[in-house]
Amino acid sequence: ALIELIVSNNKLTSLDVSANTALTLLNVNNNKLTSLDVSKNTALKFFKCADNQLASLDVSKNTALETLNCYVNQLTILDVSANTALTNLDCNSNQLTSLDVSSNTKLTSLQCHYNQLTNLNMRNGITDELTTFNATKSGTALTCIEVLDPAWATANWTSANGNIDAGVTF
């Protein structure tokens, strides 16, 4: 069975991976995909679909997912509530207006900058576990990020550190 598939940088416009149910790594970065169905790939741990033209992405069946890199697409919605094993989420440079990572208690890296966020829910209790966090360049609509420990977040995540834009509170 195919376990890893790397087809990045190939100008692909479509790809059917539904028969590859044993995949644990799928890298389709830098293609021209407008859609991709990974609902049958329930063993996926590492999924990289950055630099495509994806308008939607359903990862609800990919509960083993640890890394999701879906940056530079056209995503308006990203539901990662079922992805409780997720440690690395990079969804920067999309069109997301809301992001809820409150179910993702194992996150150590969250890159959600260059979106149109008005709501960011990080009430997952892992505030100090994040070694990489960037929610900048979301315009002026994001004014408050939901966290469990606002005092810690205020002291450690600042605009000077490049974590948030000026004026954002917790």
Predicted segment positions?
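Canonical leucine-rich repeat
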Residues: 15, 36, 57, 78, ...
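Leucine-rich solenoid repeat scaffolds
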Residues: 118-170
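Leucine-rich repeat
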Residues: 1-2, 19-23, 40-44, 61-65, ...
